[in-house]
């Protein structure tokens, strides 16, 4: 499958969706192209994913300062307690509105990551990588 870019237009903005083979290996390049001011990235991932998935993503993001959290993808994780722990870590690591949160996994972690990114500094960048 060829890599494909789809543009989603909303009332307030447009954003790209990328999909295709080996797209995880190109994440760093795509971030640099679309979000050139990002310096720090927090990956919030499913601890049940194979380590090879994390390794591919981390290798692609080697030029960025990374914080990595792995959680169980269950409803207990989608809580204010967990969100506040992540937000505190982001603030302690001086994340700002030009930095980024990446969700790596399913819906629970995507919801949690989107929530965290929207609350931190009135909204930092968010990327969802569903598995």
Give, region by region, the residue ranges found by the protein language model.
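Glycine/threonine-rich beta-strand-loop-alpha-helix active-site module
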Residues: 78-131
